[in-house]
């Protein structure tokens, strides 16, 4: 039988995605046996984040201010609005340094089987943001999973019906990729989405 505090820590670690009971136990043992200072740092950082982070009122990404740095920047192209599923997708788009518009972070994707509908992905806020009078194009940058595709389709239809230009990220062969190593579905999509030179 384990001490209640240890059991509580293991159960708390299980809330993380992809962490089952064995992984949670290994993490707990590591933090308690080998890295107590790291455990204190982790606890402090988590407490700080919970206290100081909230959602940007414009893009819904995490921010310490009411409006995040990207939304507040005067150097961004306010005519473009990229819709991404999660903050990690926002960060990936920023890392490319190829997009200079604004964002809206859904904090998920439509998944009726999991009980995630339009309200859970803040669709009403997205529509209001897209119709603010400055946005000319909405770029749907959701993932190419069945749920991401359904989310993009739903959002695209709603926004096109309101007169907005809507585009979707292209997909296909990765940069530097060799055709013999690309799966047939990706290659087929690349052929369908080809463009003239």
Swiss-Prot record:
| Record-linked InterPro entries | DNA_Rcmb_RecR, Rcmb_RecR, Rcmb_RecR_Znf, TOPRIM_dom, TOPRIM_RecR
What SUPFAM superfamilies does the database record attribute to this sequence? Recombination protein RecR
Lineage top rank: taxon: Bacteria
Which keywords annotate this record? Answer: DNA damage, DNA recombination, DNA repair, Metal-binding, Zinc, Zinc-finger
* Zinc finger motifs (C4-type), residue ranges: 56-71
The Gene Ontology biological process terms listed for this entry are: DNA recombination; DNA repair
For whether the record's keyword set contains Zinc, the answer is yes
Q: Which molecular function terms from Gene Ontology are attached?
A: DNA binding; zinc ion binding
List each copy of the Toprim domain by range: 79-174
List, alphabetically, the Gene3D superfamilies matched. Answer: 3.40.1360.10, 6.10.250.240, RecR Domain 1 (1.10.8.420)
- Free-text function comment from the UniProt entry: May play a role in DNA repair. It seems to be involved in an RecBC-independent recombinational process of DNA repair. It may act with RecF and RecO.
Q: Which HAMAP family match?
A: RecR
For this chain, the family text in UniProt reads: Belongs to the RecR family.
**What's the protein called, per UniProt?**
Recombination protein RecR
What is the organism field in this record? Thiobacillus denitrificans (strain ATCC 25259 / T1)
**Top-down, what is the taxonomic lineage of the species of origin?**
Bacteria, Pseudomonadati, Pseudomonadota, Betaproteobacteria, Nitrosomonadales
């Amino acid at each position: 039988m384990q001490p209640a505090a240890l059991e509580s820590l293991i159960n708390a670690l299980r809330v993380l995605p992809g962490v089952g009971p064995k992984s949670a136990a290994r993490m707990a043992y590591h933090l308690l046996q080998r890295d107590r200072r790291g455990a204190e740092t982790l606890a402090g950082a988590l407490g700080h984040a919970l206290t100081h982070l909230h959602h940007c009122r414009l893009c819904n990404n995490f921010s310490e201010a009411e409006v995040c740095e990207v939304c507040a920047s005067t150097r961004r192209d306010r005519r473009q609005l990229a819709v991404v599923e999660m903050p990690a997708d926002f960060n990936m788009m920023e890392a490319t340094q190829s997009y200079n518009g604004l964002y809206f972070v859904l904090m998920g994707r439509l998944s009726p089987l999991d009980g995630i509908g339009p309200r859970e992905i803040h669709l009403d806020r997205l529509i209001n943001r897209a119709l603010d009078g400055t946005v000319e194009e909405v770029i749907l940058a959701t993932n190419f999973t069945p749920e991401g595709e359904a989310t993009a389709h739903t959002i695209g239809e709603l926004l096109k019906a309101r007169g907005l230009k809507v585009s979707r990220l292209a997909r296909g062969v990765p940069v530097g990729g060799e055709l013999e190593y690309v799966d047939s579905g990706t290659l087929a999509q690349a052929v369908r989405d080809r463009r003239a030179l």
